[in-house]
Amino acid sequence: MPVTVTGGKHRFVNSRPGLIGNLAYGKFISRTLKFGEYELQFNTLPGSDTVVQIYGETIGKAFEHYTRSFGKPDTGTRYVIAQIDDESLDFYTAPGMLFISSRQFDQVRGITEDRLQREVAFQWWGQTVGLKSFDDAWLSQGLAEYSAFSLRETEVTGAKLDDFRRELLEKSLTFEQTASLLRTPGNLDDQSTAYQYIMYSKGALVFKLLRDTLGKD
C-alpha cells in the first residue's frame, strides 16, 4: 500500500476496494528477507528475532509453492509480518500482511510452521479470491488448509505420507456429528478445536477428494 508523508502525517492509499486495514505500532526491529521474487519484511520486538530466519524460510517456500500452483496473488510480492501482543489472536491475516502473537516467537514449533503455511495461503483464498457471503467461509478456510496440506505432501514419502493423509481424515471426522461445514461458522467458536477440525481439516479433505476424483490438473 503506497504511503506518503506530509507535515508529519502519514497517508495510506489503497487503489483497490477493500477494508480499511490494520496497523501494528511498536519499537520494532525490522529485517527483510528475499525468497525468489518475494520480499518478506519482519517487524519483531527485541529478543524475538531469533526465529525470523526459520519462519522466513517457511513463509518463503510457501509463497513459491503456491505461486507455482495458483499464480501470483493480487496482494503483490511484498509481505509484512508484524509481532503483536498475546491479548489478541495468535494469527491474523490482512492483504499483504500477517500479524503474529508474541508467544509464537518464544520457540520454533511444528504446529506454528504448519499454521504459517496456511496463513500465507489466505493471500490467495480470501484476499485474491473473495467470498460472496459468510456462508462461504469454509471455502476460504478449506482451500487455505488444503494448499498447506498439498505443500506438506511434497515433503514426505512412503509410510510418513500415508500417516499424514490418515491424520487429515481422522481430524475431519472427529466432530462429524457436531456441525456441518456451512453451519460451523455460526454455531461454533472459531478458536475451538471443533471449529478448526471441521473448517480446516474437513474443508481440506473435500478438496483432496475432489483432486483424487478429477486429478491434479
Q: Language-model segments: which ranges?
A:
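Acidic/His/Gly-enriched intrinsically disordered linker/tail segments
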Residues: 90-91, 137, 141-205, 209-214
